[in-house]
Amino acid sequence: MKKCDWGAGQYLHQLLSENSLKRMVGETALVPMLVDGDKLIAFCTFAPLDDIQPTDMSPWIGFVYTFPDYREHRYVGMLLDYAESIATVMDREYIYISIGHTGLYEKYGYEFYKMDKDIEGEKSRIYRKALAVEGPDKDRRYESGTKWKAEIVKAARENVDMTAYCGFSCNHCFLGEWCGG
């Protein structure tokens, strides 16, 4: 990520290095990454917030990037599908993306929703995708999201003393009600 030729990717690296990403976009933020061996192919964020704040819209996909050598293989679609699957398991009706340009997300089913100002005061285009209420798309996303959820919970519980969070309400845990604890 540090070697990314995109300023926002370098900014994400900085936020992660300083442990400040979750303060900015929410404690449940995830950073899905696609790798080829030890090489990073693509990444994004999936979080309760993005650069449009404050807002009731959630969840958000942000910092979407594919390294030049891996472009034209629709890896962005894989990242979007991951986030959409998790959002489906969370029973969200929509998923959002804030972006300054047009042309990429429309081909993945995102539609322009509205203009709003970002945290820097700049105008930004907000796109959203309706997550199917019923049908095969929702079923596929739900099945995929359930698998991802299990992996997230497993990773979060690894080397964690269960008493660290099982004695508290789900509101105090970054997993929320996902873990079933």
Would you name each region that the model predicts?
Residues 1-6, 137:
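A short, well-structured alpha-helix characteristic of acyl/acetyltransferase catalytic modules
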Residues 5-35:
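Active-site rim helix/loop that mediates acceptor-substrate recognition in acyltransferases
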Residues 29, 122-127:
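Short hydrophobic/aromatic beta-strand or adjacent loop that forms the aromatic wall/cage
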Residues 31-33, 39-49, 60, 65:
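Conserved beta-strand in the GNAT
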Residues 35-37, 129-130:
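Active-site beta-strand termini and strand-to-loop segments that position acidic
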Residues 70, 74-82:
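Conserved acetyl-CoA pyrophosphate-binding loop and the N-cap/start of the following alpha-helix
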Residues 89, 93, 99-123:
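Conserved active-site alpha-helix within GNAT-family acetyltransferase domains
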Residues 141-181:
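Cysteine-centered metal-binding/redox modules
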